[in-house]
Amino acid sequence: MTEQASSSAAGAVRSRVDRTDIAAAVLIACFVALALHGVWGQDATSDERHYFGAGLEILRAHAWTGYGARLHPPLSYYVQSLPLVWLGESSPDDPVALFPCRATSLLVFGVPLLVVAFRWARELCGPAAALVALALIVFSPTVLAHAPLLTPDVPLAATGTLALYLFHRADHGAGRPWGWGLALGLCLLSKASAWLFAAALVIDAVVMAWRRRDRGILLRVAAGVLLSYAVLLVGYGFNGLLDTKGKTELIARVPDLPLARTAAHIASPFFPLPYLKGVATQLGVGWGGWESYLVGELSRNGWWYYFLVALAVKETIACLLLLAASLIAFRWRQAGREELLLLLPPLLFFVVFSLGRVQIGIRYVLPAFPMMFIFVSSLARLRERWTRVAIGLLLAAHAAAALRASPDFIAYFNELAGGSKNGYRWLADSNLDWGQNLTRVRAYARERGIAIEPDVLPSTGLVAVRANRLVGIGDPETYRVLRETYDPVDNVGYNWLIYDLARKRGSARRQ
């Protein structure tokens, strides 16, 4: 009788696991379909024009001469350029070349990200939590918007999540470091801000070593970090590692920030010159600032609350409610090592970028989203029936919001912002207008015979203006009259606003 009961229980577990895996496969297939639908026929974004084909250029010339190639480490460039090996050199304006490159990036980085998040959540909180975490990522408009793009944001999310997951599997540094060390190396090769993942890992290891009174953890973590450093060198082909002249010239151009040049002197002998150039470029941009837009204001210094506002209007309301519920339900005094490892990356990304001067898109904190969603999935452990029903309803609402937003995921804004049609009132740049709908607006304008961004507004008729120019980025005066006197009568992809100059607003009001 006992054997029969055990066999029945084991069969039930296998059946549940099988159902969970099938559900996960369906969700991943939905993610791929939605993401590819989002970029089908979409123009290359501003950043993609810099990065397109950069990997092929680097491999052929063994040099980082292009502007895009100097901005970030090369892993995403290598992978995203793979189709061009067969298609040959092309242009980002050629959809025959652009779409395969985007699909490759999605399959190599986006899909593994989902698999890792699913497995991590299942190991921590069970199969129900795994599906919660997976659904949150799959139907996140932000993730769907950026997963297929030829940019390093989702590659960083994928490699960073993998590194921390393998670190978790290695008992937070107490186990062998080879797996997470290799993954951390790939993470460092993904984007300059990968050091935030490395910092989270090291902080977690230090806490673990202190709690266990085990210095051996620090030695094993040091070995893993050295392995990641070796992967970084190989990824750059050791290019410029011994170029002392180039490094000396670079240090002289490092922004005069506190300790920046001292740090550059210390680090320069150990890193490839192209990597140092990328870091210096990012520091220069970060120190000089970038014109940002937030709720009717322009600034080159940014706002400490920019990314909090961006999260509040760029993710679905259902997702925000689940996030709030997880923070309220979490027993902070009983926080363990797993919670620490999940919470550190979101905390570091939001704090560091909120203090910075480059605030042009929620994508800067996107790499921390998977850990945030895995943390939220812990709600699935609550046993009350009503909580499970509520979670299911909120996930359904989350998915419905993403489906309604398709294919315009970049321009998604939730109901708190008044929907995507009012996104331009809140944010701009890569949150909304990244050059993705130029072909669509040209077709729209041809059909209706309207002007696109005229330098001088006509006295009557229809005009189309993209959101970035409308809100005044780079030129606050040309379209001031539209902002203050008119409301749009239509839009194309939400980032191009259509105005009828014969229909003024009832009273002048600053938008």
Task: Please name every model-derived segment.
Residues 45-46, 145-155:
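Short acidic/glycine- and proline-prone juxtamembrane loop motifs at membrane-interface regions
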Residues 133-138, 165, 184, 188, ...:
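Short helix- or helix-capping micro-motifs
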Residues 103-124, 162:
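Transmembrane-helix motifs of polytopic, lipid-linked glycan transferases
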Residues 26-28, 324, 334-354, 482-486:
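Transmembrane alpha-helix segments characteristic
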Residues 310, 315-336, 388:
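Hydrophobic, aromatic-rich transmembrane alpha-helices
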Residues 1-9, 288-290, 295, 396, ...:
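C-terminal luminal/periplasmic domains and tails of membrane-associated envelope-modifying transferases
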Residues 163-177:
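Membrane-interface transmembrane helices that cradle and orient dolichyl/undecaprenyl
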Residues 28, 221-230, 331, 335, ...:
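Signature aromatic-anchored transmembrane alpha helix within multi-pass, membrane-resident enzymes
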